[in-house]
Each structure stands twice: as C-alpha cells, then as structure tokens.
Amino acid sequence: MSHVRRFDHVGITVSDLNTVTAFFVGLGLEVEGTRTFVEGEFLDTVIGIPDSRTEIVMLRPPDGGTRLELSSFVRPDHQPGSPAAMANELGLRNVAFEVDDLQAAVDRLAADGYGLVGDIGQYEHIWRMAYVRGPEGIIVSLAERIG
C-alpha cells in the first residue's frame, strides 16, 4: 500500500521573490491565487525555525500539473547557498519543464540575461534538452520531445 497520493509541488527558497516569479511566469507558469504570508505556530512547528515568517507564491503549469512553490523568508533572514552550484553537487539541483520549442525558450531567456549551463544536447531521437541558469543560480532544465 502506498502512502503517496500524488506529487503536489516542489519548493524553492529564494531571496528576490519578484525576480524569480517573473522568470518562471516568463517561461509560461501561471500564478495560482495570491501571494501569501505564512507565520505562527504551524510554520514554526513544521520547519523547526522559531518565530519564522515567509512569503509564498505558488505557480502552476498551464496543464495544471505539479506546482512550484517559491518562498522568501522575512525572518529569519535567508541563508545563502552557492549561486553557481553545478549539477553534480548534492541536493536539489534542477527543476525541469517540457517545452514546445526549446530554441525559442532558450533564446527568450538569453534575451533576459539567462544563459546556458552547458549547451543544447540531444538524447537519442527522443529529446532535445538544455540547462539554463536562472535567477539566484536556479538550474532550469528545458526539454523538447522530438520523437
């Protein structure tokens, strides 16, 4: 018997909620609901940080699949990670999206100042894929099904 019912969301803690939200909205995600501040006993208990307060934006893909939660801590101040972490460093390293036109997505992000981590690669005759370094060092994997 499985205890997991579905994959609900992936959470990313960020410093600049506006910039990161705009990046993902530019990729085609949609803001779900309104920005929300969360604080109090519930948050302190779940995350194990007393007197914490965070602002959250939930984003969803147009098809309504797994959501992306962006969280920016008001208190305590966020702890910076490595903004240049590479794909082989331990921990969550990328968030992946299937796109209709990989080159167009890469070109649009490049126009906004976001570059490739490596280059565009092809896996057999099935996928074209690239890693883009987004705001705050977030690695975003973009994949286009070609076969």
What is each PLM-predicted segment?
Residues 1-21, 27-35, 91-97, 146-147:
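N-terminal beta-strand motif that seeds the catalytic metal site of vicinal oxygen chelate
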Residues 72-76, 144-147:
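Acetyl-CoA-dependent GNAT
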Residues 13-65, 104, 111, 130:
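Core segments of cupin and vicinal oxygen chelate
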Residues 40-45, 78-82, 119, 123:
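A cross-kingdom feature marking solvent-exposed beta-strand/loop segments within repeated
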Residues 7-15, 55-74, 81-108, 128-133, ...:
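Vicinal oxygen chelate
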